[in-house]
Amino acid sequence: MGRNQKQNFFAARKRQKRENGPKRTDRQAQPYEEIKRDNAFFIKYYQLQKICATDEEWTQFLASIRDNLPTTFRVTGFKDEAKALLSIIETQLFTEYVRAVAELHQKAPEDVERPLCLPWYPNGLAYQLHLTRKDIRRSEPLYRLHNFLIVETTAGGISRQEAVSMIPPIVLDVRPTDKVLDMCAAPGSKTAQLIEALHAAPEEHKIPPGFVLANDVDNNRCYMLVHQAKRLNSPCLLVTNHDSSVFPNLVTTKPDGSKAILKFDKILCDVPCSGDGTLRKNPDIWLKWNLAQAYNLHGIQYRIVRRGAEMLEVGGRLVYSTCSLNPIENEAVLQRIIKDADGALELVDAGHLVPGLKYKPGMTDWKLATKEVDQIFTRFEEVPESLHTIIRPGMFPLPADEMAKIGLEKCLRVLPHLQDSGGFFVAVLEKRRQLSFEKNDVVELVKLNETAKQPAAEPQVDADGKPIEEKSVPWGPQRKKRRLHGYKEDPYVFFGENDPDYQAIKEFYQLDESLSQRCLLTRCVTEKKKNIYYCSEPIRDLVLNNENNIKIINTGVKTFVRCENRHTVHPFRLAQEGLQTSNAFMGASRRIQVEREDLVMMLNCTDPTQPPSTHELKKETQERCKELGVGSCILKYVDQRFTLYTVGWRGTSSLRAYVQKDETIHILRLLGADLSKFETNKYEDARVAAAAAADAEVGKSAEAEADSSGDGDATESTFSGSGAIDVTVAAETTGTPMDTEVVATS
């Protein structure tokens, strides 16, 4: 009890409370206190705005927003195997879904409603399940569905995303040649959609000429954005961290070598909002909602869309969206920017891009009120002076004649009850001419960037070698150094001409001349290259011209990884993440076509120290192996429906796949192989663990009883001490080949 032999009263009380209180497993079974889905101010305010045409519709609206949100997901459309995965979903997965839901709700299978294919999503690639996220996560009959959603999301086969959140990228209408800016991109589900659209024509472009620049003001959320977007392994993505309302002008290099201010073809402004359209997904908003949120956000929303309009190319398209129902955050912001643009911006109707979507037109009349909705204002003159800093003139609707010219009815208002979804607002703007308030001075911007790149001047010293203090200050206002928040990022070091590592890579993999070594980069300056990344030419140009102008979080896709092995002279292996890119430029010498049975066997081999022997492969594959030297290679499998490419390793007498666990399961699913080896049932695992813990507790009690009744001469248990088996080590041996840098050569 310590040196002073005094017992700590507070520690003892805490220990007693922990021992006598409910166990963690007991608490997990207890639900959170149910949130009361009601807010008098919310109901009064939206009744005032007449967002529903009739009392009957208002009743439907209230019933809908008080209900939980169904789960939705979409299939990644640009991948070659998308149709095959969709077929598996519609047959195997949904058959299992019907069986599990019938068991969960104790219904007959024929009474279970099948998942709904969203009619407005392109190519029928999105589905809505009549289950909530909590249903899927906490119900044992649905564990296979839960496993599928987790694995396929990680592998990039699908994306879990709220249905209405899919609308803005669709109406933005991105093409492979577009320069796209996502101004408020985190957490990244819409960014992933934009990347998919950019890669929609792989047969036309090895690497899309366009790019997606995804930005967010929150440094931590930027890493969430990277995690979401990296699943698609695009070399055409750049992630930045900046306040989008003051996003800097970026410099780009024109074909003639001159510099220019970058203008974007497509811009997505999914601005911060009060989020009251997400009440079904986030019921805690019922407790926090108040009208002051919309008033506070209106200004920042306007500044973001105004900055977006400045950076938009003439003829370009900007989509403004929120997950709010409030006209103060929606129509009021749009009428203000359109009025300030003085004819340079025009609202366009994009309803034809989402055929089958049910929505209402934008509002042309609305009212403002106090926080408690006890005073209603129709004109700014009615607002008390004490509220003038909160309620501004631009928030009120324009006179009817001016409003008619703006065309706010072209906006899309999606209400929850229309198609069992969340609430959302979308508007599409096109730029007809340059804005009067645009600033396009490229000369000063280039000078600032070049100055930042110059090395620091040598310090001046006196006769004794001591540094001389600088006392003179340049004349005029001084430019403050921008403070960067968050983590300090590693540098982006691009390959120079005749880089020795690139020459070795090019020779070993027979890389095409069209793959520019200038676009390969590492994240270290002095150390030996470990990971080599690839980015597209436009992304490289953006990084080099603007690395001192904006904080860059991430770019490039991992393409080559150092993996030295005594049986091969080449020190770099291919990375599965970059295979989508490198495959388009590689020669035939490091490729091998394999049969289905071979690929299934290799993917099922999860022990990196025991790779499949070439003698176990089919004869056709064995013959092809004879022409392939030791080292990294591409395994190609051709199916009637799709072609699969995976990274492999040819050992001296073995051939193995080099794929992470989730992608392994994804490929095996496409091949129709048995997945039981990888299947996990967390409920069964919990029961086994609980039973083991109970047995251990019984054993301890028996041992204690024996000790108390014995004469004190009992020997130690043969299972104690260093001879005990560590079951966690045994469990960890089921890891995947990517968990280690060991390369088997047997």
Swiss-Prot record:
Compartments, as annotated in UniProt: Nucleus, Nucleolus
Pfam family, one: PUA_NSUN2
Keyword Methyltransferase appears in the UniProt entry: yes
Gene Ontology biological process terms in this record: RNA methylation; short-term memory; tRNA methylation
Catalysed conversion reaction: cytidine(34) in tRNA precursor + S-adenosyl-L-methionine = 5-methylcytidine(34) in tRNA precursor + S-adenosyl-L-homocysteine + H(+)
Key words of the record: Methyltransferase, Nucleus, Phosphoprotein, RNA-binding, S-adenosyl-L-methionine, Transferase, tRNA processing, tRNA-binding
EC numbers for this chain: 2.1.1.203
Chain spans, region Disordered: 1-30, 454-475, 701-746
Stretches with biased composition (Acidic residues): 704-714
Keyword Disulfide bond: no
Superkingdom of origin organism: Eukaryota
Chain residues that bind S-adenosyl-L-methionine: C184, A185, A186, P187, G188, S189, K190, D216, D243, D270
GO cellular component: cytoplasm; mitochondrion; nucleolus; nucleus
Signal peptide feature range: none
Tissue: Ubiquitously expressed during embryonic development. Some enrichment is observed in the proventriculus area of the foregut and in the hindgut.
Any one GO MF annotation of this record: tRNA (cytidine-5-)-methyltransferase activity
The protein's enzyme class: transferase
Disulfide bonds: none
Catalytic site positions: C323
Biased amino acid composition, Basic and acidic residues: 18-30, 463-472
Protein's job: RNA methyltransferase that methylates tRNAs. Methylates cytosine to 5-methylcytosine (m5C) at position 34 of intron-containing tRNA(Leu)(CAA) precursors. Required for short-term memory.
Family: Belongs to the class I-like SAM-binding methyltransferase superfamily. RsmB/NOP family. TRM4 subfamily.
Protein name: tRNA (cytosine(34)-C(5))-methyltransferase
Lineage: Eukaryota, Metazoa, Ecdysozoa, Arthropoda, Hexapoda
